[in-house]
Each structure stands twice: as structure tokens, then as C-alpha cells.
Amino acid sequence: MPSGRLQQQFIRLWQCCDGKTQDTTLNELADLLNCSRRHMRTLLNTMQARGWLTWEAEVGRGKRSRLTFLYTGLALQQQRAEDLLEQDRIDQLVQLVGDKSAVRQMLISHLGRSFRQGRHILRVLYYRPMHNLLPGTALRRSETHIARQIFSSLTRVNEENGELEADIAHHWQQISPLLWRFYLRPGIHFHHGRELEMEDVISSLTRINTLPLYSHITKIDSPTAWTLDIHLSQPDRWLPWLLGQVPAMILPRKWETLANFASHPIGTGPYAVRRNTPNQLKILAFDDYFGYRALIDEVNVWVLPDISEEPACGLMLEGPIQGGEKAIESRLEEGCYYLLFDARTPRGAHPQVREWVSHVLSPTNLLYHADEPLQQLWFPAYGLLPRWHHARPGPGEKPAGLETLTLTFYREHIEHRVIARIMSALLAEHQVHLHIQEIDYDQWHAGEIESDIWLNSANFTLPLDFSLFAHLCEVPLLQNCIPRDWQGDAAQWRAGEMNLANWCQQLLANKAIVPLIHHWLIIQGQRSMRGLRMNTLGWFDFKSAWFAPPDP
């Protein structure tokens, strides 16, 4: 019998007997474990051989045998839990232990660095699974970061300074205002072993032509080997940066025929997905990566939903150590939580409603009514970026007849729930009921259901001149809620003629967008890690981080 199954049987037997020595029979024990008398004898002999118990059998009618436990079920359960942790079988660990608080402590104690069979392993604790990693679809902040570790694109944007770097394309040039040429590296391989071909690149870029920022691409062809021409309908100074974004990452041309591609994608990036379950995401360094091979061999993201109840935890790489020493990387996000008024509903479009609601739900009001741990993480927002002060909150009078408002946000985000509760209480003081809708992220991103106001958080990446407009423009919800000439704005942005500060100020002037709070992004640990630099998404580039090897 496998060791794990035998351990489970012993724990069950120990629990049924309360761990006490007793006189019993094979039949009675077999009934307890729902097995045959013969199988029960085999179990007892095997457990005795392991030193877990003694079984003093008595032969004869009416005779009772003595069962003595030498090992406690709790001790064996702990040993079994340790084995499951080492094997990264978190789902079985949760079933074994049952108590989520105990599971959490076990996970935290095993976070951080592990050195096994010459391989460096990093374990991270996170609060939700990441089922969808498919570029070009609605991806949240963390999925966006993970996708960048799995896939490559023609270009790459440096996370630290926003500068453009070579990736699949080693050089590029603008042939004319409407034609860009990219020169691709040969010999690149996908994680499943096949060599990258030009058709993979062309099909990947063609599939995203329906997205607003890529809709001006009219033709993609290859005039010579490993040369790619991209034809545009209007000039775009940002095209090389655009082709370094997650939607433009390169997929195998027949990706739709590959099983579970969204959760187990195949790219050409520094890490390949090995496992993606509700309890764990495991990615391994790709030995045939065309760039510098990652120094951390394996990254395990352990999922424990209950930690979402503690918004201050941030990204946890290592548990507490003796003496209370803390190793924390933090930064104020380039972005904010904000309210979005929906012009498609009468209440959402009403200027007086916008003015009054933004007054009642002002950043200072939210901060004042938040719990102390959150007050330390929140900073009042008066613009989309921390350095901007575009919002001009007025006194505002409550519109006559306003009795209810509908607020919508997406699931699995504890701070959205906290903010919504505070908003509900503040509005209730004015006899306004806040109806709250919590929906899937895909639904939220599409913005096709009815809501007066929407709650969102935006994290802008470097360079901000690129990402601020690109991020807002690529979310269908915003285009649905804010009636304006988005195509005209995009043309102006592509031409480099947009004053982004003025453009954002326009959105805030009519209260289409109301900034609420800036949030401190936090990474707890890792004391022994080198090269860890937090990016604007609250994560760090796995392939650039490393551990000093253990002492010989």
C-alpha cells in the first residue's frame, strides 16, 4: 500500500479510537475502517512494522486483542503534511489538515527559498488562482505579470526604466510613416519543442487586430526570411512599444487545438507552465530559452484564498523569522482605485449625481472610515497618478429623488469589498441605498451589464506616456461608459500629439472618472534573494532574481 494511503488509514484509526490503548477485535476495527477482516489484519501488521502501533492478537472465541498506539495521529498527520508540502500537493494538504488556519501556517513556514537536488525553488503565497493566462483576453494585474514570464514578443519593455529592448526581433526600423520592418531571431523554440516559424508570428499579430490599439494594422507579411513587415492605416510612433505588450505576445499558430491552453499556455518565454490548479501555479525555467536562462529553476505560487482577508499582506515570499526582522519591498502604485460613472444609465449620466456622489465618497471620507491597517496602505488620490492633482471636488447637493445607486466590481478582490462597504455606509447616512453587484472579471471588463457606477483599480506600467492611454483605451468597459471620440484620441496619441495630463484632466473634470486612493504595493521577503526589484504591477521579474548558493 502506498505510504500516503497507509498514513491516512492510521490517522483515521487513531481518531476512531481516540488514540487510547484498548481491547478490541479485528471485526470491530474492520467495521471502523469499512474494510474486510483480512485487509484489517494486513493494515495492522504493516502499521506495526512501521512502529506506529502494537497489535497483540489473541486467538479463540470471545478473546479480545490489545491495540496500543505508539505514534499519535497528529504527529503522523504533521509528517504527512510535510511530505505533501515537499511534493507541492496543496490540494491534498487542504483535505488532510482541514483547518485552513493550520494550512496557512504550514505554507508560510515553507515559503521562500528551497534548494533541492541542485535546483533553486521559490515559493510564493497568493490569495487567488490564475486560471486564464491567454494573451489578448481580459487579464488582471497578476495574470499580466505571469504571462510576461511565459511568453515572448517582438520587443520587450524594460520594467525598471520603460526603455524598449530587443526580444524575438533583434532590430527594427521605420521604413515609412505607414510601414515598420522587424528582423527576427532564428532558432527560437516553444516550450513543447517546436521551432518558432514566421507563420506563428503573423497569426499571433493578426488575431489581435480586433483590439482597439491594434485595429490600424492593415497587413502583415514577410518579404524575406526572418523579416516581418507591418503595414498601418495611420502613423504610430508607439508601435514598437505596442508590440511588446501582453496582447501581442507570440503563440503557436494552432494554439486553439492545444488542450487547456488558457490555463496551461505554451510560449517561448523564460518559464514554462508545469501545473496550474485552483491550489497552485508551478512554472519551470525553460532550458532552451533564447535569452539568458533564468537563475531560479522553479517558481511555485501557492494559492490560499483566506489570505485575501488581509489586504496588508501583499505578495508574500517568506514567513516571519526570529527577532521580528522584516524585509519589505514597497512602492506607491502608478495608478489608483477609481470610480467610473456609466453614461448609459440616467443616474450615471446625471451631472448633479456625479458631483454629489464624488463629494460624499471623497478620498478623505473613505480613508477616515477605513480600518487602521488599510489607512497605512492607502493614500488619497486626486489624479490618476500620485503626482497629479486634477480632481476638484465640490460641495454638491443631493439630487432630488435619488434613493438608490448600483455599484459593480469584480470578484476576488478584498479591497473592492472593503471600499464598497464604506461607500454603502456613507451613502446610507444620506438615505441612499447602494446596490452592490460582484461579477466575474470577464464580465466587468466587457462592461455589458447595467450599473450606475463601477469600481476599478489601474496599475500603469513604464513608460507612463505609453501605458496610461493604452491601458484605459484597451478596456471595453471605459469606452462603453464614457462617450467620446476614442478613435480620434487614439490617432492623436499614436501621432505623439496628445497631452496626456490634459486628456486625463478632461475625464476628471466632468466626473466620468473619480480617483479614490493610491495604494502601497508590498512584497514581504525575501532576505536571501538578490536582484529583486518590484515592478509597477507589484511583482518582480523572476528570471532576473537569484539566490546565492548554500554554503558548502
Swiss-Prot record:
Pfam families: SBP_bac_5, SgrR_N. Keywords: Activator, DNA-binding, Repressor, Transcription, Transcription regulation. The keyword DNA-binding applies. The lineage of its organism: Bacteria, Pseudomonadati, Pseudomonadota, Gammaproteobacteria, Enterobacterales. GO terms for biological process: negative regulation of DNA-templated transcription; peptide transport; positive regulation of DNA-templated transcription. Residues 1-116 form the HTH marR-type domain. Activates the small RNA gene sgrS under glucose-phosphate stress conditions as well as yfdZ. Represses its own transcription under both stress and non-stress conditions. Might act as a sensor of the intracellular accumulation of phosphoglucose by binding these molecules in its C-terminal solute-binding domain. Residues 163-493 are annotated as: Solute-binding. It comes from the Bacteria. This is HTH-type transcriptional regulator SgrR. GO terms for molecular function: DNA binding; peptide transmembrane transporter activity. Residues 26-49 bind DNA. It comes from Salmonella typhimurium (strain LT2 / SGSC1412 / ATCC 700720).
